[in-house]
Amino acid sequence: MVVRGNTQSSTDTIWSYQILTKIQALQQTNTGFPPGIFPSTRVYAYNKNNSKNDPNVFFTGLIVHTLKKYHKLCTPYQQRIINQIVKDGLSSVGVFKNKSGRDTYNFWRTDTPQIFPNAGWLNKFDKSQSLPDDFDDSVILLWAQEVTKERAAVVHDTMQLYANTKVKSIKNSLPAFKNLPAYSTWFGKKMPIDFDMAVLCNVLSFVNAYDLQWTASDSASLQLITTAIDNKWHVTKADFIAPHYAKPAVIMYHIARLLTAGNQQNIQTLIALKPILLKQTDSLLANSKDPLENVLLSSARVHFGGIPIITSQTPDQAAIEQSKYPFFIANMASMLPSPVKRPLSKLAFAKFEYRCPAYNLALLWENRYLCVPLHK
């Protein structure tokens, strides 16, 4: 246990307040975005100078969820800031909801179908090529809104219809997963089955947080996660095993989040891997060069049983806020058959990297809380 004086505690509380007010300020400067939606940009990986505003709901859902997680432990004034951020952030999520009324969500707004907003000639295909709702945004937004268990259970039932082997089988994963009835990433019936290890972590986090009835597809999804860890594929084949996240540090963060979500009785096989995950995380930390990557790994290692890395050095807030390390990636090769997917997944011309300064700050705020409790 680290005993800190009142001066350090006050400094941490002020620091927390400053981060929250900066996050709120970023939310209020979102010209060109729906009200309350945090600004994010889409960067073409092949040409990093090609950056476009991307009005998605993904990062807003993550920020709301992250801040709400620690709300009860904040000072009353900080709670008021978080309350306003949450209220504003959730005010526009309805335009991203399934246009037929189903309780699922899309990455982009559904009232005016789009693919890659502000993409010039690509937007001629907005209606014909618009993406279906996805599991990732759906569970993130339902969780952020704290929907009832009854609503969560209905969506969970719907998910069972989109698992591998239900109607079609995956054609672009590792041989070990070919017949595994794990969840696809998409709700669309016309979409090929698409596995993403990080997305599956989010889905199971949602299932456990709501203590929903565990299904065969939940078990299969957990099996995919633990098999990948056993074989270290989340490190050596990150862009293949999690094509929409693609970075080992980001995958580690998602695994850690699953290990802290709700009822843990169904994930004992994953809990048993915490010592291995801690060792892998420390190895990645030793070679990390990006400040945001450091934040993700530092947060993950605490949940894997590591002793918090406590430092008196003030984090480089500006460097983390403007980090070019991508938390999320649009990988156009992710749905191609295996022989094509494997090489193309590594190439920059098939990817768009997403950045959100406000979410970077939320991750930093969370990390500081985990490593040095801010409000004690």
Residue ranges and their predicted role:
Residues 4-376:
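Preference for long, amphipathic alpha-helical scaffolds in soluble/luminal domains
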